Amino acid sequence: MARDYYAILGVERDATDNEIKKAYRKLARKYHPDVNDTEEAAEKFSKISIAQEVLLDAEKRRIVDMGGDPMAQGGGDAGYGAGGGLGDIFEAFFGGGGGSRGPRSRVQPGSDALLRTTLTLEEAYLGTKKPITIDTAILCDRCEGTGSKSKSKPNVCSTCNGSGEIQQMQRSFLGNVMTSSPCPTCRGTGEVIPDPCDKCGGDGRVRTQRDLIVNVPAGIADGMRIRMAGQGEVGPGGGPAGDLYIEVMMQQHPVFQREGNDLHMSVHVPMVDAALGATTSVESLSGDAIDFEIPAGVQPAETIVIEGKGMPQLRGEGFGNMIAHVDVSIPTQLDEKSKELLNKLRDHRSDESSVRTADDSDDSLFGRLRNRFRR
């Protein structure tokens, strides 16, 4: 039967590498032979070491997730050296680990940047070119990213002899241990610039403000991001720039409310137009007038769908719909002529009484309440 390596470390099956390492270190502090010399602890430490090795290896972990046991397929037992052992113990307590990692490159990739910009619904409908200003790091034009006044190559750090690390002996409950930490002189790169640029201080980059133009595609929606490749910050030592992301925030529109690619609006219909029908219009986001019909007998809260007059499909073809929500306006003040006409209408339709029994149809208010309580 395959061993449950997740259970051995006490982690979930979707645990990240960092979560696996953290669980291993926690158990290693308890079961390492230097702190617990029992046979049971030695066996437990061997198991957690093997479990860490397996779960940190992508191929072995895949076998485990398929129900197999990679250590039963010629993998053997890892013992104390599997997946870290003492090195991980040292790292857990002293931060630098027990072994040398070597110098890191002085030239590093730049960071991505995020900027938020506000758009009107009209701009999102038509697409636009949006000017922005960002505070960012750019390549130093004086040293061209080398960090050196003379643009010469850096020298080997004399403090760490190019290793990027310094080592020192520390006492612990494990005895005397040799720990490594980044060299403070070269900051872990193993190199120093003998004549730092007086503009960037040897960093190879300077901070400045840049003006850019963002191409906003038609149909973009609130919360979406536009990626501008290579427009982020230049990295230390003149490393390649990261990307710039522009996050869109939409202003509230006085007429339309967007849902997906549909545009919703409220249309106020006079009582007479609701009864007889009418033609009305609304100004679209492009500035054109859109005419549409109010059908005779339309009721309050009914919707009228105007096909193809909504938002454009982002990077595609077609448009959403415009949806008008009917609000029938009942007059509150009437002149004598209007009262006379309405009284004549009421007399003409005298067979319609305002006193009604409760409508018991399924579509009525009482019908809906009845059906709900029957559930």
Swiss-Prot record:
GO terms (molecular function) for this protein are:
ATP binding; heat shock protein binding; unfolded protein binding; zinc ion binding
The coenzyme or cofactor needed here is: Zn(2+)
Q: Name one GO biological process term.
A: protein refolding
Give the record's keywords alphabetically.
Chaperone, Cytoplasm, DNA replication, Metal-binding, Repeat, Stress response, Zinc, Zinc-finger
Q: Which Pfam families match?
A: DnaJ, DnaJ_C, DnaJ_CXXCXGXG
Does the keyword section mention Methyltransferase? no
Annotated SUPFAM superfamilies: Chaperone J-domain (SSF46565), DnaJ/Hsp40 cysteine-rich domain (SSF57938), HSP40/DnaJ peptide-binding domain (SSF49493)
Which cellular component terms (GO) are annotated to the entry?
Answer: cytoplasm
| Domain of life, source organism | Bacteria
Query: Which of this chain's residues are annotated to bind Zn(2+) 2?
Result: C157, C160, C183, C186
PANTHER family in UniProt: CHAPERONE PROTEIN DNAJ, DNAJ HOMOLOG 1, MITOCHONDRIAL-RELATED
Subunit and partners:
Homodimer.
**Name used for this protein in its record:** Chaperone protein DnaJ 1
According to its UniProt entry, this protein's organism is: Corynebacterium diphtheriae (strain ATCC 700971 / NCTC 13129 / Biotype gravis)
Upper classification of the source organism reads:
Bacteria, Bacillati, Actinomycetota, Actinomycetes, Mycobacteriales
